[in-house]
Amino acid sequence: MRASKYHLNTLKEAPAEAEIASHQLMTRAGMIRKLAGGIYTYMPLGLKVIRKIEGIVREEMNAAGAIELLMPVVQPAELWMESGRWEQYGAELLRIKDRHQRDFVLQPTSEEVITDIARNEIQSYRQLPLNFYHIQTKFRDERRPRFGLMRGREFTMKDAYSFDRDEAGAQRSYDIMYAAYQRIFQRLGLEFRAVAADTGSIGGSRSHEFQVIADTGEDLIVYNPESDYAANIELAEAPALLATRAAPGQDLEAVPTPGAAKCEDVAKLLDLPLARTIKSIVLAVDQPEGPAQVWLLLLRGDHELNEIKAGKLPGLAGFRFATETEILDHFGCKPGYLGPIKTARPVHVVADRTVANMADFVCGANREDYHYQGANWGRDLPEPELVADLRNVVEGDPSPDGKGALSIQRGIEVGHVFFLGTKYSEALKATFLDDNGKPAVLQMGCYGIGVTRIVGAAIEQNHDARGIIWPRAIAPYEVVICPVGWGKSETVRDTALALYEALRARGVDVMLDDRDSRPGVMFAEWELIGVPLRVTVGERGLNEGVVELQARREAEAAKVPVDQALAQTLAKLDLL
């Protein structure tokens, strides 16, 4: 491609709303243009990157035995009602009506449609296993779309769905997709981790996320540098930090703590380590009849509640945080001084594993401006009703696999695989005849990749102050040839054109900038766009018999003989 025939429209400044590097740089590089909140036009450079990502995804999905189809964006509400997700999904599901006032949705995902296809198309075990996939537009009505393509409302995803005759087969399909995802992200040239994850609203019993490592990532990834253990912080198991409970060494005492409503303030006031304090978190679970059940969750003062773990405990499904009225009713005190000793009304008490082994701890006294010091289980209050893992792990916690300590880094989720089992096939009655001629329910898996999100994630991981630094596999162009003096020197033009044609003949995706721009402007624009390799052809260099090669990641250019320019360019590309 020649730049004079292409649409390039870079900007010096990013829009004020662009908070992160990928949003800023994609806008400045002319890759996207905002149409509405969370909705973007993919301009030629942006679309080129997307198509390259789709190509790699498609190749690996086909190689793994998946079969491509294309399901509609608009789906009838009846299928969502049948699965139960019409009521469950919430405001992110964009509901629409046609001219006949029939309900439809703009698809955020396609489990219902693919299961409907399966129940109509799969009759016999002889047709199994099957794995269908599509690459399609999705829409989720995010409350606050932000970060450009990272959290937009309209986006492109690859969804795959496997169907098997039994659980063992479904697990094999899961493993095949897991391996395919590893290959996809390796080919994309991204640093990533596959981590165990919660299944969330999709459901199922087994799940892994594929996270691109980036400091701006919204997710926290827990991993063990000494082993293969890795999990999303939502799922990472937090051990008890005390193996046994020490004997009481202090008497229980109510001490004044005026204005100290936080554990940090209490610890400072009493000159104690924060780890000696206990924080109280009050949850409520609404009941079909009568008042809500109230639960008191206890964590060490320096730990944070993991809401995913809490929601999985018996009796806490669908919990909410208690209202101030409910707190006053059960504790006789406002938040900030709550504790498990002498509550005004009975509550269910759940202690984190570490809290259950603490002795002589500090907790709220259920009296404003007072805390108890020297509190002990069994002596001053009953043993907790339940002991459970309630907290987020922290850096340095022992690894659950017993092999060293945990580290934490940030990541951007770009892929997710789920073992669904029969969650959707049972709800939609997707059955087949087994080898005994009897009806059996299909076992399912689903596997998603955020195609457009990968674009943003790749930039978050690969950029500097000058612009984007694309991995070669997904760069809009692999090489840009920058002739200095295009309009003045026939030798420069001929040399640049010859190299351009030679690279094209060898299948290299190359751009020739024939706009006769000033060198500084031309170089800055291509550094912003992030093409991996630049070849500079100038009259001064040609007089010395050389051209210059500069990889986007490198600070210095290398001079190579003109007659070796093609070979050296190809060799340099192979290193990128």
UniProtKB/Swiss-Prot annotation:
Query: What Gene Ontology terms describe what this protein does at the molecular function level?
Result: aminoacyl-tRNA deacylase activity; ATP binding; proline-tRNA ligase activity
What biological process terms from GO does the record include? prolyl-tRNA aminoacylation
Tell me the CDD domains matching this sequence. Answer: ProRS-INS (cd04334), ProRS_anticodon_short (cd00861), ProRS_core_prok (cd00779)
**Per UniProt, which keywords does this protein have?**
Aminoacyl-tRNA synthetase, ATP-binding, Cytoplasm, Ligase, Nucleotide-binding, Protein biosynthesis
Give the main location.
cytoplasm
Q: What class of enzyme is it?
A: ligase
Q: Which EC number applies?
A: 6.1.1.15
- Which PROSITE patterns does UniProt cross-reference here? AA_TRNA_LIGASE_II
NCBIfam families for this protein = PRK09194.1, proS_fam_II
User: This protein is called what?
Assistant: Proline--tRNA ligase
